[in-house]
């Protein structure tokens, strides 16, 4: 049975499990984890009664589990997912959603070479900050695409960890470690905050988008058993500090460990990020013992209001974390959804919010919860 504190369920959507949910202009975009389900589009003008208005599919062998929408455009990813349809190819689908009930494919942008496609990205209505595979590189890199002409996207710039560009003559130093993989960038101003899976996170200066340059990075290597999923910049100072929230994902552990958690960095001097705090769901790690995957942190909402950040915490649902005091982040609410029928536990995978403060929590296996909070 669902459990709640400072939250209340508004409505529940029965839909295939998904990887990302995004709200734009009373429309909810839900990207699904497994083919043939691609993207579902809902009218949520009345959040108590969401209505399915469109649905896209993808061929077996690929999934389209990420979605963003802005300025009448919807961008979805195409990434390899098991075997099948090699001719389909990885990349991005760019759609006209000026009428959300009638999404129209404008262009399919394909990655170079025979790589796996695009994983996750940021999109501001013009530029897409993506994590594609690319010919000549080992693992996903960071790339900026200009979609001013959505029928003809143009690459603006790219960045990678030195050593990834083996076709360019770089020495590859990770034969005995996990290969580099850009998970996704997030833009704030002229900076990109880039998560890089088992290779930490990086801050890039993109004042000149054609030449992204490294400001700093933190890579704990094998000292951190969990991959880094998100590097989320807080928009204003907190107690005089510039703050970056870093979420590690509770999967792909390098060795048995307690559940993954979130870290807080002071980036007031962005050339020297300093970890100043951590957050774990209270009671989840009582003794430091190793636990199965997908019990701990997955990711924060990339949209939020004030200092309360909604997190998707896999089996432990939605956690509302207040970082007003960045030295002591604290939980101020939660919503733990019912376990989807046929599964052993919930798997809250993604979360976003709308301008009215409603929270949209998407399960990896099945279902989406629309939740309200009394935290303002």
Regions flagged by a language model, labelled:
Residues 1-376:
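Feature marking well-ordered beta-strand scaffolds used for ligand recognition
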């Amino acid at each position: 049975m669902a459990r709640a504190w400072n939250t209340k369920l508004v409505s529940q959507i029965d839909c295939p499990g998904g990887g990302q949910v995004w709200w734009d202009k009373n429309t909810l975009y839900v990207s699904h984890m497994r083919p043939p389900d691609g993207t579902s589009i809902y009218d949520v003008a009345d959040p108590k009664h969401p209505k399915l208005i469109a649905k896209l599919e993808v061929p077996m062998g690929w999934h389209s589990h990420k979605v963003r929408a802005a300025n009448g455009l919807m961008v979805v990813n195409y990434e390899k997912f098991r075997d099948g349809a090699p001719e389909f190819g990885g990349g991005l689908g760019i759609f006209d959603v000026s009428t959300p009930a009638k999404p129209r494919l404008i262009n399919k942008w394909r990655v170079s070479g025979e790589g796996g496609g695009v994983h996750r990205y940021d999109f501001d209505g013009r530029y897409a900050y993506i994590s594609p595979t690319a010919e000549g590189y080992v693992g996903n890199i960071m790339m900026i695409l200009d979609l001013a002409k959505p029928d003809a996207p143009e690459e603006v710039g790219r960045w990678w960890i030195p050593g990834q560009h083996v076709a360019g003559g770089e020495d590859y130093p990770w034969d005995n470690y996990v290969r580099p993989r850009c998970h996704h960038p997030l833009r704030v101003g002229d900076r990109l905050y880039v998560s890089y899976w088992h290779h930490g996170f990086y801050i890039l200066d993109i004042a000149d988008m054609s030449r992204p340059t490294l400001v700093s990075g933190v890579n704990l290597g094998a000292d951190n058993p969990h991959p880094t999923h998100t590097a989320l910049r807080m928009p204003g100072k907190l107690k005089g500090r510039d703050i970056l929230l870093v979420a590690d994902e509770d999967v792909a552990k390098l060795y048995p460990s307690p559940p993954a958690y979130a870290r807080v960095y002071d980036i007031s001097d962005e050339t020297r990020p300093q970890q100043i705090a951590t957050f774990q769901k209270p009671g989840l790690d009582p003794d430091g013992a190793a636990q199965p995957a997908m019990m701990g942190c997955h990711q924060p909402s990339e949209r939020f209001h004030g200092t309360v950040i909604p997190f998707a915490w896999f089996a432990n649902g939605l956690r509302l974390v207040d970082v007003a005091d960045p030295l002591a982040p604290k939980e101020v609410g939660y919503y733990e959804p019912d376990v989807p029928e046929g599964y052993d536990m919930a798997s809250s995978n993604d979360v976003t919010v709308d301008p009215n403060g409603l929270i949209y929590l998407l399960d990896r296996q099945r279902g989406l919860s629309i939740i309200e909070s009394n935290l303002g």
